[in-house]
UniProtKB/Swiss-Prot annotation:
PANTHER family reported for this sequence: GTPASE ERA (PTHR42698), GTPASE ERA, MITOCHONDRIAL (PTHR42698:SF1)
UniProt KW NADP keyword: no
Residue ranges, annotated region (G1): 16-23
Protein name: GTPase Era
GO biological process: ribosomal small subunit assembly
Residue ranges constituting the Era-type G domain according to the UniProt record: 8-176
Domain of life: Bacteria
The protein's role, per its UniProt record: An essential GTPase that binds both GDP and GTP, with rapid nucleotide exchange. Plays a role in 16S rRNA processing and 30S ribosomal subunit biogenesis and possibly also in cell cycle regulation and energy metabolism.
Complexes and interactors: Monomer.
Amino acid sequence: MTQTVPYRCGRIAVIGRPNVGKSTLTNALVGTKISIVSNRPQTTRHRLLGIATFPEGQIVLVDTPGLHREQKHPMNRLMNRTARGSLEDVDAALLVTESTHWNEEDTLAYNLLNDTGIPVVLVINKIDRFKDKSALLPFLTHINENHTFTTIHPVSALKRKGLETLVSDLLALLPEGDPMFSEDEITDRSQRFLASELVREQVMRQLGEELPYATTVEIEYFTENTGLFRIGALIWVERESQKAIVIGKGGARLKEIGVKARQQMERLFQTKVFLETWVRVRKDWSNNEAALKTFGYE
C-alpha cells in the first residue's frame, strides 16, 4: 500500500543585508518576477509575499528590505522595522548572504534570527561567480565553526542552481496543512502595487546612484479594458534639480524609464499596457516619516 505524503504549507521569511539577492531568490522560487531587482541598495522597500506552490506543498515567502546598520535616515529605520516585523508568525527563515562575503550586517541579521528560536536556513547566493566551487570551502568552514544553521545551501538564484534541494529542505520545515493560497496566485500584492514597483525599478536601475533615496512612485490611475491596461505613474522626487535628472534631455530619460517599465508590465500582466509617466517634486519627502506613510511605507 502506497503511503500518501502529507501536504505542507507555511510562511518563511527571507532576511539579509542589502544586495545579496533576496528578491532574485524569491522570484526564482516563485517561478516568475514579482519582486523588483537592481544592484542598488533600497531596491526592496516593502514586505511582499511570494507564493511558491509545488505538488508536495506551498511555501509562502516573505520578501523583506535589506537590514541596515545605518539607521539615521528615516527610510532605513522604516525598512528595518519592516524586516523585523516580517518575523512574526513565520515557521522558518532564510538568511541570504553573498558567497565568501560575511560582514557586520550579516551578523546583525544572524543575531536577529537566532533570538527568534525558529529554524534558520543559510543560503549562500551568487556561487555562479566561482568557476572553481572549492573556493567556497574556507568560507563554509568558517560559517560552520562560528554559526548554527538548520541547513546550508550554496545557490545561484540568478542561474536557478541549487534550488531543488533548497525547496525540499524548506518544505520539510513546514507544518502539515492545506494551502493558504490558490495554485494560480503568486503574490498578495495588487497589480497596481506591482506596476508602481516596476516603474521604480527602472528609476533605480538608471538613476539609483544619483538619486538613492529621493524617488518613489505613485499610481494615479489603473484601468483594465479587454486586452489593454491603462496606467498612469507619478514619479516623486525631492528637488527641482532631481526632476530634471529624471526627465533627461528632451524627455529622453523619462521615455526610456517608461518604455522599459511598460515592457516588464506586459510580461507580468500578460496583456498590452499603455503607460503614462510624469514627475513631481515634494521637498524632503524621504526624511519625513509622515510623508513616507502617505506613500505606503509602513
